Amino acid sequence: MAQGSGDQRAVGIADPEESSPNMIVYCKIEDIITKMQDDKTGGVPIRTVKSFLSKIPSVVTGTDIVQWLMKNLSIEDPVEAIHLGSLIAAQGYIFPISDHVLTMKDDGTFYRFQAPYFWPSNCWEPENTDYAIYLCKRTMQNKARLELADYEAENLARLQRAFARKWEFIFMQAEAQVKIDRKKDKTERKILDSQERAFWDVHRPVPGCVNTTEMDIRKCRRLKNPQKVKKSVYGVTDETQSQSPVHIPSQPIRKTTKDDIRKQITFLNAQIDRHCLKMSKVAESLIAYTEQYVEYDPFITPAEPSNPWISDDITLWDIEMSKEPSQQRVKRWGFSFDEILKDQVGRDQFLRFLESEFSSENLRFWLSVQDLKKQPLQDVAKRVEEIWQEFLAPGAPSAINLDSHSYEITSQNVKDGGRYTFEDAQEHIYKLMKSDSYARFLRSNAYQDLLLAKKKGKSLAGKRLTGLMQSS
């Protein structure tokens, strides 16, 4: 009955947007609803209930729906079945016939199935003009069940002010709809009125209720074209659809061009070559990183020596004055090349090692380029020339080893010097030091002796500081 009446009312159903992020949910719900209405496969009993001086057609009780969900979906807990029923009702597929709040109750409350024409899978985005026609039509029918609720009366007054210039047209549309409805059978009209009311309860919900039609911004970003083409519930032509005072009108969907397809192919080819890690590998890397740096996080591991501003222990200042790196500091240099570069003492130790091997020009060039980026603009050109003459010019006293491609780019950049003139050369030298010089430094006796000396001297330093504090 509901399906047939919905088809008669339809002005023209547009094809559902299969790209909608909610379409998977809608399909699952509609599969449940279809089975629920199928009498041949044991659906929910739909019946006409006799009331005082009237009949209530095509209704089911909340208890029947909950029991059907528990039986056919293997749900053991009634609370879970009620929750699932409420989620289905919130989307407008099932609705209470006497309440604007779309929820499920496990009692004798009467519910009715929504017509397929009004299903959310049709991607409705109704205009406020349609809502104004609906509310205006309700006021023309002197029936208790069609009286406006308080929030609906407020909405009607607001819409009347917003559409003051075209209210006459809206009123005429509402009158035309009322005339059409009066020609229908009384029972059919009663069902259609409730289904129409439920449709607007979904798209213009009661204040305090969740609007299930609002799109999640994260889902919208995954859409190829998140904009929808708005369509009128009552078949109002495009020229009469004015800009909504609430919603921003959508633009027509642009046709896909050859350039769009080429860009998509290029993007997909890049995705094929992209190295993707499994979540298990990512988790392992994150755990390993956390375990490696846990002793350097003062929120997790108490700092040694302690912060003198908190504990009144000046051991940290004594160590800093001695300019000898602590064991933790030396150990951290071995974590990565960046760790030793961002530590002043680490850079000094690394530079001494490179000087002993007569290969310090790479690090000095890298540090000079870093310093160039911090220079005042008026000194940049002069500093660029100095770096070029020292490291890259023919016959430079500290010539560095660059590949031909990087050297050619740098030569062009020097003609119009700036802070990032040596960016390519610096990156090449960085990779060279990371793969060669840094690895040799970690294996060198200089680093190993420094690390072992700190381990051996830790207890002696503690005893010496303790003795100084006792004597004072």
UniProtKB/Swiss-Prot annotation:
Regulates G protein-coupled receptor signaling cascades. Inhibits signal transduction by increasing the GTPase activity of G protein alpha subunits, thereby driving them into their inactive GDP-bound form. The RGS6/GNB5 dimer enhances GNAO1 GTPase activity. Residues 40-115 form the DEP domain. Interacts with GNB5. Interacts with RGS7BP, leading to regulate the subcellular location of the heterodimer formed with GNB5. Interacts with GNAI1. The keyword Nucleus applies. It is found in: Cytoplasm; Cytoplasm, Cytosol; Membrane; Nucleus. GO terms for molecular function: GTPase activator activity. It comes from the Eukaryota. Residues 336-451 form the RGS domain. This is Regulator of G-protein signaling 6. The lineage of its organism: Eukaryota, Metazoa, Chordata, Craniata, Vertebrata. The keyword Nucleotide-binding does not apply. One of its GO terms (biological process) is regulation of G protein-coupled receptor signaling pathway. It is a peripheral membrane protein. Keywords: Cell membrane, Cytoplasm, Membrane, Nucleus, Signal transduction inhibitor.
